[in-house]
Structures are given as C-alpha cells and as structure tokens.
C-alpha cells in the first residue's frame, strides 16, 4: 500500500472527493494492523475532515459499522472495485472491504428493502458464528471446475495468518478456507502471490490451480461467498482471496470462470 496515495476515486452520489491515505486511522483496530484501513474508514475520514456530515454506528448484531445518514440523507450502500476492475454489486461489510492502492469507492442511495436484506444476512452470519462457539464452520464448500465437481459440508476454517501484515492474528479469509482443505488433503491447490497481473495491481494471493484445473489468461477460478436464501449476484465481487474476510456465511463456492 502506498501510504501517501492521494486518491480521487471516491464518489458519494455525483460528488467526488480526494483524501490522503497517510492521514487515515481505522475504526476497526481489532481487524486491521496499523497502516491499513477499509472503505468505511475512508468515509469516516471524510466526515472527520468536514467534507461530509456522516452519522454512523457499530451494530454488534451484524458485526459491522453501518451508515445512518450522509448529509442528512439515509439509505446509503456502495460498490467498490480494485485497480483495473469494474463496478460490481456486493453484500460485503464495508468495514471489512480493504482499501488498496488504485481502488474506487462509490456510494449511492439504495432501496430500504435491499439494505434490510443485506443486514439480515449479516445478522444470520453472526448468529451462526455464535451458535458454533466462535468457530467459523461453513455449511458447505462447493467446487465446480472445468473437469471436476466436489462438495464438502461443515468445514471448520483454521486461520493460517498468511496476511498477518494487514490483519490481526486469527482473522479468517477465503485463503484460509483453501489452506484448511489443502492441509486436510481434501484438495490439491497451488496458491501464489501476485504483485501485479498485467497492468492490474494485485498485492495478494491468487488461486493458480485446483485439483488439476489451472488458470490461463482470463480463464480460471472465481468464487462467491454468501447465503443460499438470497440472490447470488451480490456474492461475486472480485476481491482477492487473501483479503476476503469471512464471518460465517452459508457457503463458499469456487467455479470455473471463462
């Protein structure tokens, strides 16, 4: 991360904002190590600088910060994407979405029923984690490759702390899920660190191959994380596996993307 990055890629409605990332501190020190912050932290910073009137709170029932209003207006949601990416809908906690160099963040007014659907998912995740005594146990892991299909049930994910420069020890991500299955000899996968891929800034781990299916060019593995009860389009933002934090979703699915 370039800590002196001055980014113009933040929009609230039709208004754009600049910020100096060296000035930011996270409101989630239990998740991020010093020097790292989330998309939500960018909003808090804009509020503290007087650029917007931000009202927010932390809701423990959802394990996330929520925006109550911006400049007196309610019902905000967001989309974001990383360098060389494109806009994607999501149902991912904004304070878990790591800010990276070259990222874009845009907030927009959403339908209240849409927001309540997302908040319901968050509450279900927290409840599931509590019912499992704080352990992350995935109801189902699905793998649908070019040449294989596998499913695993009740997968307890173990933190490997491979992103310990960014996250506090014990944080669990999609990367940890893959490493858990690999350590148990349930899958054979090759995971490598990429600083860049083509022109895109990555700075994360990439699933290169899984049980013989290996990516090439734009063909390879993608994934989604979410709930079977809600439309799946919200669960596929292109977030690298090392920085997609997991609380306790219904499932994780890896699929072959052409």
Name each model-derived stretch:
Residues 1-258:
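Ubiquitin-like/PB1-type beta-grasp interaction modules and other compact soluble beta-rich domains
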């Amino acid at each position: 991360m370039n800590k002196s990055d001055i980014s113009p890629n933040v929009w609230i409605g039709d208004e754009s904002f600049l910020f100096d990332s060296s000035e930011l501190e996270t409101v989630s020190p239990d998740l991020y190590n010093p020097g790292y912050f989330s998309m939500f932290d960018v909003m808090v910073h804009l509020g503290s600088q007087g650029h917007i009137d931000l009202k927010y709170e932390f809701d423990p029932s959802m394990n996330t910060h929520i925006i109550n209003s911006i400049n007196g207006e309610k019902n905000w949601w967001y989309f974001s994407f990383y360098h060389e990416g494109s806009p994607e809908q999501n149902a991912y906690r904004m304070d878990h979405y790591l800010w990276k160099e070259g990222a874009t963040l845009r907030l927009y007014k959403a339908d209240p029923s849409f927001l309540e659907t997302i908040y319901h998912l968050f509450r279900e995740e927290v409840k599931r984690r509590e019912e499992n005594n704080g352990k992350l146990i995935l109801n189902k892991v699905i793998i649908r490759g070019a040449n294989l299909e596998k499913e695993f049930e009740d997968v307890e994910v173990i933190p490997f702390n491979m992103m310990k420069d960014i996250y506090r020890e014990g944080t669990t991500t999609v990367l940890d899920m893959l490493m858990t299955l690999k350590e148990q000899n349930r899958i054979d996968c090759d995971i490598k660190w990429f600083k860049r891929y083509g022109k895109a800034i990555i700075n994360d781990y990439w699933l290169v191959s899984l049980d013989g299916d290996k990516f090439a060019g734009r063909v390879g593995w993608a994934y989604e994380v979410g709930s079977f009860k809600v439309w799946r389009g919200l669960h596929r933002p292109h977030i690298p596996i090392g920085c997609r934090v997991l609380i306790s979703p219904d499932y994780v699915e890896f699929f072959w993307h052409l």
